[in-house]
Amino acid sequence: MKTTRSESLFAEAQSLFPGGVNSPVRAFRAVGGTPRFIARGEGALIFDVDGNRYIDYVLSWGPLIAGHTHPDVVAAIAEQAARGTSFGAPTELESELARLIIQAMPAVEMVRFVSSGTEAAMSALRLARAATRRDKVIKFAGCYHGHFDGFLVQAGSGVATLGLPDSPGVTAATAAGTLTAPYNDLDAVEALLKANPGEVAAIAVEPVAGNMGLVLPQPGFLAGLRRLADEHGALLIFDEVMTGFRVAYGGAQGRYGITPDLTCLGKVIGGGLPAAAYGGRRELMELIAPAGPVYQAGTLSGNPLAMAAGIATLRIIGAPGVFERLEQATAALCAGFERAAADADIPLRAAYAGSMWGFFFTGDPVVDYASAKKADTRRYARFFHAMLERGVYLAPAQFEAAFVSLAHSDALIQETIAAAADALRSL
């Protein structure tokens, strides 16, 4: 596979950007080799600057549930761009997208748009602290809520990939306000609440963990968090930046039937453009300025291009049968990977929720960050490159989720499974 153009561009990029990239995982540090520079996308496919074609399971890290360059999304962006790209003033598009979100998620009675998942999580925590008049937050080891200082403790995603326990620059005082528990461990959460009586403002969780690889919530875990939050006067924050409109149209809260106090959204709601949001009960959201005293603002919040792309995307995936088709494709993919691994006598466990999926090279159950870290990351790196050579683009790190789009046809799913079988035999 020819990669000379990507190699040349990456060499130049390293003189322009820290590590040659604008988000760490893109640098291929966890798997080695040269990042592919992408020239264009079409449906479920991406093409790099050297002309190589790949079936894409990264999908811009989740937003592109309709696939690359879906004609409805492209048309919506083009039509809005012709009218204006940004106004810094209210638009009807903001209200239209907000209504779609509120209709899909009963826990969200009001919403505030921001431009990134980090902003959404940061703002939701500030609101929770103001509402409860408490300072501490419980998060879960390996869960990632953006690069805000208060959540950058035992974080997942690129932090996990780079093996950083925490980030330099986060003050000890800030870190002290962030309590961590193992994912899926209700006893640990209860112990933290009892050890910090009246001090915990919120429990923040990825309802399906997607930043330590994909780890599913154990039966009763999310319901247990709801119960513990209620018993101890804390708010429950679902970070659905990844799971919202991805594991079900109504997100993880709809899939599992749990009602959080606050919800963070991103990725899918922007249709591939920078958009995120946080929302919740009316009495909480009315504490946000200018209705209330909790300040939050943003120059590009509710940007009309992103709103247009988000509306088009939610209309596409809101059609009958969409999530059934997505889940069937994802289930087939996971079953195919496990079958291919078994045939190659290689331990592999795959899991999925909706159109979000992942796998670990291990024979043991993966229920939290500690068990995820026991998986064979060196084998993952070899498998990643073997798949890349066979035209399949997976996440360049073990500790990331993968995604399926509406553009992933049965033929592409079977092509991927065949590539995986061949790649596994080569390891």
Curated annotation (Swiss-Prot):
GO terms for biological process: chlorophyll biosynthetic process; protoporphyrinogen IX biosynthetic process. GO terms for cellular component: cytoplasm. Keywords: Chlorophyll biosynthesis, Cytoplasm, Isomerase, Porphyrin biosynthesis, Pyridoxal phosphate. Its cofactor is pyridoxal 5'-phosphate. It is an enzyme of class 5 (isomerase). PROSITE patterns: AA_TRANSFER_CLASS_3. Its main location: cytoplasm. It is found in: Cytoplasm. It catalyses: (S)-4-amino-5-oxopentanoate = 5-aminolevulinate. GO terms for molecular function: glutamate-1-semialdehyde 2,1-aminomutase activity; pyridoxal phosphate binding; transaminase activity. The keyword Mitochondrion does not apply. Belongs to the class-III pyridoxal-phosphate-dependent aminotransferase family. HemL subfamily. This is Glutamate-1-semialdehyde 2,1-aminomutase. It comes from Roseiflexus sp. (strain RS-1).
